[in-house]
UniProtKB/Swiss-Prot annotation:
GTPase that plays an essential role in the late steps of ribosome biogenesis. PANTHER family: GTPASE DER. It comes from Streptococcus pyogenes serotype M4 (strain MGAS10750). Associates with the 50S ribosomal subunit. The gene is der. The keyword GTP-binding applies. NCBIfam families: GTPase_EngA, small_GTP. GTP 2 binds at residues 181-188, 229-233, 294-297. Transmembrane segments: none annotated. This is GTPase Der.
Length: 436
């Protein structure tokens, strides 16, 4: 399901991040603590009155060295381009400032609903001061104390009221994938090369994100795919569209909409911190993953080049041991014909279901190899396991005490399940739960 987007904008020190965390609440989830996964809290999922939405803190996108007014103009532009609802945060302690008026004039021109949140209204006496904010021309101001959680429910009510109508569920038979990576790694060239393959029949379709054009194609076997438009690559972009932080946000939106994510690395430049950050988002979102090294034709190679690259990738992306690596060239079309079949196999892994009886045989065999651990004289006891969902495959292991299930033993069980059932290109999640 594609989630609508809510963007938070405002000048520095008005409490955007605090409000962001308050709205997102516990839904900013960290699936596991894995070295090498760099997290960024500019993007999360919020939920209110049974409506989910993607939440963006545009302040986290800025270049802190940029001029002050340029930063807030940048935020407003991103919000107007990306969001279905904009939350404009101002400070009740400071009153209306020149910067607030500057942003309001930009936002006034948009057709996107704007909710004016007056933050730092920490006591009832301050509520009388919020009326000055009517001068911004953005409708009723909502008094909020994000530190204390006061008034955030009213803001959330307004957000949900202004969200677009929920879209129908998409066809599960269609495999949705996206190409993500730093600017200038060759994503656009790869897209054009893939769509130029003789084996595919492509047609553009209107995307569900703002102004996006996704591409639908069918391979020679009749499998339907939708290539998610990433970062507006297929439309003319703004100057700021090629900044890395901005492309992080766009990539995360594409990840949300994808079943399988192709992480594209430039062979000429190698692996960068950005690559690990984006791959971490896809991993934590439970998406299928392929690591695509593009521009392979530009390297001088010997018999050890592939092995060296694979070793470096496995070292840099230790949390992606399950992801296949493929070396391609958009220019020469080297190995591009292998991508559709690889995407299909990973989609099958994402949707694979294991019968409980077969799964528990593997669990019992694993315990025989490596007995369950003890803590303070008490031994972990595993009663049974069952698969509860797909995309990604998720298993619940019922135990006597959740606290006795150490992360390392859970990882051992995961490895045993992988050895038995493969699960190519997809993370799998194991959850320990106390049997009632």
């Amino acid at each position: 399901m594609v989630l609508p987007t809510v963007a938070i904008v405002g000048r520095p020190n008005v409490g955007k991040s605090t409000l962001f965390n308050r709205i997102a609440g516990e839904r900013i989830s960290i699936v596991e603590d894995v070295e090498g996964v760099t997290r960024d809290r500019i993007y999360a999922t919020g939920e209110w009155l049974n409506r989910q939405f993607s939440l963006i803190d545009t302040g986290g996108i800025d270049d802190v060295d940029a001029p002050f007014m340029e930063q807030i103009k940048h935020q407003a532009q991103i919000a107007m381009e990306e969001a279905d609802v904009i939350v404009f945060v101002v400070s009740g302690k400071e009153g209306v400032t020149d910067a607030d008026e500057y942003v309001s004039k930009i936002l006034y021109r948009t057709n996107t609903p704007v909710i004016l949140a007056v933050n730092k209204v920490d006591n009832p006496e301050m509520r009388n001061d919020i009326y000055d904010f009517y001068s911004l021309g953005l409708g009723d101001p909502y008094p909020v104390s994000s530190v204390h959680g006061i008034g955030t429910g009213d803001v959330l009510d307004a957000i949900v009221e202004n969200l677009p109508v929920e879209e129908a569920e998409e066809n599960d038979d269609i495999i949705r994938f996206s190409l993500i990576g730093r600017p200038n790694v060759g994503k656009s060239s790869l897209i054009n090369a893939i769509l130029g393959e003789d084996r595919v029949i492509a047609s553009p379709v209107a995307g569900t994100t703002r102004d996006a054009i996704d591409t639908h194609f069918t391979d020679a076997d009749g499998q339907e795919f939708t290539m998610i438009d990433t970062a507006g690559m297929r439309k003319s972009g703004k100057i700021y569209e090629n900044t890395e932080k901005y492309s992080v946000m766009r990539a995360m939106r594409a990840i949300d909409r994808s079943d399988v994510v192709l992480m594209v690395i430039n062979a000429e430049e190698g692996i960068r911190e950005y690559d690990k950050r984006i791959a971490g988002f896809a991993h934590e979102a439970g998406k299928g993953m392929i690591i695509v090294v593009n521009k392979w034709d530009t390297l001088d190679k010997d018999n050890h080049t592939v092995a060296k690259w694979e070793a470096d990738i496995r070292d840099q992306f230790q949390f992606l041991t399950y992801a296949p690596i493929i070396f391609v060239s958009a220019l020469t079309k080297q190995r591009l014909n292998k991508l559709p079949d690889l995407i299909k196999r990973i989609s099958e892994s994402q949707n694979k279901r294991i019968p409980s009886a077969v799964l528990n045989d593997v669990i019992m065999d694993a315990i025989a190899i490596n007995p369950t651990p003890t803590d303070k004289g008490k031994r972990l006891k595993i009663f049974y396991a069952t698969q509860v969902s797909v995309k990604p495959p998720t298993f619940v292991v019922f135990v006597n005490e959740e606290e006795l299930m150490h992360f390392s033993y859970l990882r051992f069980l995961e490895n045993q399940i992988r050895a038995a059932f493969t699960f190519e290109g997809t993370p799998i999640h194991l959850i320990a739960r106390k049997r009632k």
